């Protein structure tokens, strides 16, 4: 299964890439929202998206809105936006789950597995 990891912080992308690969998934990476939409369009077999909110060019909320126009792919937000209202807004916009930074990679992977059940 392919998992798209989207974050403008290369260190976070690399960390999540390691955990995703160690769990037997095939990671695909993007560093902003526009790149994420391109990857989703060119890889229709992506099973899940791990998505940051605050990114250049196109933020994660806009990515969620665009994806939700024609897809029900699971979206797990991993964001530094930590207030209850941030989480609620992410879920209302169309995210399936929301984890705040700093995060425990084991928790993120548990949520990935849960969303892929």
Feature locations, PLM:
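Non-catalytic signal-transmission and effector/linker regions of two-component phosphorelay proteins
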Residues: 1-4, 116
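Conserved sequence signature across two-component system core domains
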Residues: 6-7, 30, 49, 99
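Active-site residues of response regulator receiver
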Residues: 7, 52, 79
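Two-component/phosphorelay signaling modules centered on CheY-like receiver
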Residues: 10-28
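Acidic, metal-coordinating helix/loop segments flanking the phosphotransfer/catalytic sites
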Residues: 29-48
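Receiver (REC) domain active-site loop signature in two-component systems and cognate sites
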Residues: 55
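Basic, amphipathic DNA-recognition helix from helix-turn-helix-like DNA-binding domains
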Residues: 65, 69, 74-117
């Amino acid at each position: 299964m392919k998992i798209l990891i989207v974050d403008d912080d290369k260190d976070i992308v690399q960390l999540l890439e390691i955990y995703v690969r160690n769990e037997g998934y095939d990671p695909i990476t993007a560093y902003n929202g526009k790149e994420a939409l391109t990857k989703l369009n060119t890889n229709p077999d992506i099973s899940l998206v791990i998505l940051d909110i605050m990114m250049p060019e196109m933020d994660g909320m806009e990515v969620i809105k665009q994806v939700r126009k024609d897809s029900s792919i699971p979206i797990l937000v991993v964001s530094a936006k930590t207030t209850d209202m941030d989480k609620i807004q992410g879920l209302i916009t169309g995210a399936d789950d929301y984890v705040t930074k700093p995060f425990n990679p084991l928790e993120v992977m548990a949520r990935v597995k849960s969303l892929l059940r």
